[in-house]
């Protein structure tokens, strides 16, 4: 689908006309980080996982913003033939995009589930380190060499090997001299952690926070975000999980999502205090 002059690639599962579920990946990642999770919901939902611009098989832009990325989420949801407003599930950078989508398009988002996206004050040292880490992606001679070099940021002690191999393979594209990573290094041009802070009080749809036990959303940060959301958002810890919880604890993530979605289907939302 075309959004604001860029072609946005997405994958879809489930029958058109079912309630919608949209999965949004993190920074330097892509839609295939979600395939082994998203497909589990196809019997009840029309499911989509997109490549944000600057990632995966979507076009690159001259500049990037949360506002543009959330327009892409809404555009994919509309194009994928979902019944009514979808629930959006976002990890890391995708969690900030999910918050922006809920805040900017309240009439078009039914719910938001944010996975280990820590909203904090600006940290120039962290942002500089992240930009330098992803600057100038290397060209590798072949797929196997590149896949052997694949690492997440931050790194974790455990991953499911079958997931990592698929994710690594789908992260690469052919170029002169071999293969390189698909993402645009300039997507790391600003602080998403701090820019998301003002979004939280504006979210009016259902929202839930998933916190990885060994991730970046600490209990203190989770409590702060809970307060900013008017004390109506459950903060759910995924045990044993690192920041990239779909790579090391995918079954726990699927179970937590199924439980939450079943509750939302049969319950009345709390109102903000």
Task: State the predicted function of each range.
Residues 3-13, 36-39, 48-89, 255:
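Active-site loop/oxyanion-hole signature of alpha/beta-hydrolase fold enzymes
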Residues 241-250, 254:
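Catalytic histidine-centered segment of alpha/beta-hydrolase-like enzymes
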Residues 206-241:
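Conserved loop-alpha-helix segment in the C-terminal half of the alpha/beta-hydrolase fold
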């Amino acid at each position: 689908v075309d959004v604001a002059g860029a072609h946005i690639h997405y994958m879809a599962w489930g029958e058109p006309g079912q309630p919608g579920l949209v999965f949004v990946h993190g920074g330097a990642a892509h839609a295939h980080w979600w395939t082994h999770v998203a497909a589990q919901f196809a019997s009840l939902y029309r499911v989509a996982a997109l490549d944000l611009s600057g990632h995966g098989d979507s076009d690159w832009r001259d500049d990037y913003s949360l506002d543009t990325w959330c327009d892409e989420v809404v555009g994919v949801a509309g194009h994928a033939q979902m019944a009514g407003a979808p629930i959006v599930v976002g990890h890391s950078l995708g969690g900030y995009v999910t918050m922006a989508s809920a805040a900017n398009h309240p009439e078009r988002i039914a719910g938001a589930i944010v996975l280990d996206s820590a909203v904090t004050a600006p940290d120039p040292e962290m942002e500089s380190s992240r930009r330098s880490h992803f600057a100038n992606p290397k060209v590798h001679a072949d797929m196997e060499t590149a896949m052997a070099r694949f690492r997440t940021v931050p790194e974790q002690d455990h991953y499911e090997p079958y997931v990592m191999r698929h994710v690594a393979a789908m992260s690469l594209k052919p170029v002169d001299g071999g293969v390189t990573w698909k993402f645009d290094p300039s997507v790391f041009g600003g602080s998403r952690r701090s820019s998301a802070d003002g979004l939280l009080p504006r979210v009016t749809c259902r929202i839930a926070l998933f916190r990885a036990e060994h991730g970046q959303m600490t209990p203190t940060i989770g409590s702060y975000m809970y307060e900013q959301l008017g004390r109506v958002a459950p903060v759910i810890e995924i045990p044993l999980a690192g920041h990239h919880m779909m790579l090391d604890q995918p079954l726990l993530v699927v179970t937590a999502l199924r439980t939450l979605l079943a509750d939302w289907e049969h319950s009345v939302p709390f109102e903000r205090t």
